[in-house]
Amino acid sequence: MSEVESLINIPVEHCSNIFGQFDEYAKVIEKTLKVTIIVRDSSVKVIGAEAAVQRASGVLNYLYELSKRGNQITRQNVDYSIAQSFEEKADSLIEIDSDTVCRTIAGRPIKPKTFGQKEYVDAIRDKMIVFGVGPAGTGKTYLAMAMAINAFKNNEVNKIILTRPAIEAGEKLGLLPGDLQSKVDPYLRPLYDALFQIMGAESFNANMEKGLIEVAPLAYMRGRTLDNAFIILDEAQNTTPAQMKMFLTRIGFGSKVVVTGDMTQKDLPRDTVSGLEVATKVLSKVEEIAFIKLTNKDVVRHPLVQKIVKAYEDYEENQAKAAKRREARKGSQTGRRKNRYDY
């Protein structure tokens, strides 16, 4: 197969950001897309098969655009742009970077980083209730938190309510030491951490004291009507159907709700059906409700986490297929008329 060359102009001041320390990112692009990248000052030459060169050029142009906008290029940016180049979406990736949800107390912009995350953020803007379902590391809770804080700062809502079911990893609150607050705090700690990072401790504590930010176990929602609030239910896979119904019927006028969960991390007793699973079936046709499914492609943590998530997804898919085959065989044996050779 004949090789082609493509020449890209990337100013020297952007090269270290784009190609990574010790050319780490350049090597990833070369290995994955099967191209050769040669850098001479601001001239970047890409050599390889025509389709591969087009993909690599699209990836490099995208990373250059990110760098021009002041972004620190990460391995996640590189891996995701490579993956999207195979789907011919690399050119439209820059549109995602244009969407800044809000900024942290340190001034860092919080943005969706994948097409799935962009769809999730847009759904939160447009719909009254949004279910974000997907594996760990896809930004479900963090982006929802950023959207809540942005709505609060813009006076779109009067308060933020964050809640979780207090059932995780097989622990029961009654068996844990301390008073109720000390028992539930570990379950709510990830929510506190995100709020501290985005708002800053001073602003967070001031709004907590005023009752404008509330972080509480799901059981505290019973019997209330929540008006003009941005409400986030995290770890929803650990709700029962009754708890989910109770929560969703608390919603009042002017409120927005985001429900996040990961069905692969359910901590309910073995025979208990998840309220999140039931809700996706019961409410899927309600127009004001959006269901956004995030996948391993939307994982923005360490690349190894993405591989782990993908391995578990493949395993669970194979297990489900095997269970269906067993059920089919069982059904065919039950329906078959016995003959004299059957025991």
Question: What does each model-identified segment do?
Answer:
Residues 13-31:
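Short amphipathic alpha-helix segments
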Residues 105-117, 122-233, 237-343:
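Conserved helicase motor core of SF1/SF2 NTP-dependent helicases
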Residues 31-38:
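A short, structured beta-strand/loop element
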Residues 18, 25, 55-59, 244-247:
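Hydrophobic side chains in well-ordered alpha-helices
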Residues 13, 23, 50-51, 238, ...:
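Short, surface-exposed acidic/glycine-rich loop or hinge patches that mediate macromolecular interfaces
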Residues 86-108, 112-115:
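Conserved loop-to-helix interface motifs that mediate assembly, gating, or partner/ligand docking
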Residues 1-17:
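Short glycine-/aliphatic-rich beta-strand segments at the starts of folded cytosolic domains
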Residues 38-97:
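Interdomain "pre-motor" coupling segment immediately N-terminal to P-loop NTPase/helicase cores
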